[in-house]
Regions:
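Bacterial N-terminal signal peptides that target proteins for export
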Residues: 1-5
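Hydrophobic alpha-helical segments of integral membrane proteins
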Residues: 8-16, 93, 321
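N-terminal periplasmic/intermembrane-space "pro-region" immediately following the signal or transit peptide
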Residues: 10-12, 17-44, 295-302, 345, ...
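Outer membrane beta-barrel
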Residues: 21-163, 172-176, 181-190, 248-260, ...
Length: 350
């Protein structure tokens, strides 16, 4: 009897020691969230005389919260110029300390927090990107970013990156970005951004600077997004400049149907961004039919709006392009000064 009692006491003591060494919890570890999207398209190009159907893109995203941090990664396989390629489109480790949650620190590859347009189709309201998005500003950074929320209406951010749209640094310098974002009204968001750094291969000279401003207005049935990008690059005695502006408007006509229009202008008088001195203009208009709402995730809304990303969206658009200098190459290799394109795009978010 005495030995049994001693054994029970020893077992109890051992269990208490084990409990002190390893905390007991009944909470389940947060699962890895898997989401993504797929894009199918039909394109018509008047200048080349081509009509093409394509399974254009598929992206798979992983999201994993770990304490005060989270990991977000996205692998994207896209078809471009007839060839498919897979890349790490986003890979971000972000940490927000619970004792100072107005701060957040991120590291990896991420969308440049500039302007209204994004490179992923579900995050846009129209199925083509503007000349301004393509030429006037960076779309991706690889580096680190810091965000500080001063108040619910004011946020500041800073980025140190390898450069404009490069995964590996192409020179010894780094590109710096600062951004201030202000919400004066609950339906208005204004952002001001500055970017500075060397961008040419194997050279720390020719510093490139960019001033960018973007405005988003969300009035429920009407969403307007506009951006202005003014850039300059230092060069011996020339200092070429460029200016890109774009404005997009979306009107919700019914519960499931909307209409989008965009005007875009890219002025490149020195040809530093487009290859030849020119002014590019485009007008794009088209309807969107959307059904159901995608599940909640790291990207659940069009940025700075209450427009919830639909699970299924069918979008059509007619786009007219003009250039002050022949720029659009036809099937015979001759440049033309104008072009017309038609697009039918299906986007499915899972």
């Amino acid at each position: 009897m005495r030995s049994a009692l001693c054994g029970a006491l020893l077992c109890g003591a051992a269990m208490r020691v084990a409990a002190q060494e390893r905390a007991v919890t009944f909470e389940e570890a947060a699962p890895v969230g898997i989401s993504g999207f797929a894009v199918g398209r039909a394109d018509y190009d008047r200048v080349t005389g081509s009509t093409t159907f394509a399974a254009g893109k598929i992206a798979v995203s992983l999201f994993k919260p770990v304490g005060d941090a989270y990991l977000f990664g996205q692998l994207t396989t896209a078809l471009e110029d007839g060839a498919a390629a897979t890349e790490i489109d986003n890979l971000l480790v972000s940490w927000t300390p619970h004792t100072a949650n107005q701060w957040s620190l991120g590291f990896g590859r991420f969308d440049a927090p500039i302007g209204f347009e994004r490179d992923d189709e579900p995050l846009n309201l129209i199925p083509t990107n503007s000349f301004t998005f393509t030429y006037a500003r960076p779309t991706k950074f690889t580096g680190m970013q810091v965000h500080y929320t001063i108040s619910p209406q004011l946020d500041v951010a800073a980025v140190a990156a390898n450069g404009w749209d490069v995964t590996v640094d192409n020179n010894r310098g780094k590109t710096a970005m600062t951004r201030v974002e202000w919400i004066p009204l609950h339906w208005v968001t204004l952002g001001v951004t500055g970017v500075y750094g060397p961008e040419r291969d194997s050279s720390d000279a020719h510093q490139r600077s960019l001033f960018s401003s973007d405005l988003t207005v969300d009035r429920g049935r009407l969403v307007v997004g506009a951006e202005l990008n003014l850039g300059r690059e230092l060069d011996s005695g020339v200092n070429p400049t460029w200016l890109g502006v774009a404005a997009t408007a979306f009107v919700r006509l019914t519960r499931d149907i909307g209409l989008t229009a965009r005007y875009d202008q890219m002025e490149d008088p020195d040809g530093v961004r487009t290859g030849i001195p020119q002014i590019l203009r485009s007008v794009t208009v088209g309807p969107m039919w959307y059904f159901s709402s995608a599940r909640e995730g790291i990207f659940s809304n069009i940025e700075h709006t209450r427009f919830h990303i639909p699970q299924v969206a069918l979008r059509a658009a007619i786009r007219a392009d003009w250039s002050s200098t022949p720029f659009f190459v036809d099937a015979g290799g001759a440049p033309q000064s104008s072009n017309t394109k038609g697009v039918l795009e299906l986007v499915y978010v899972f």
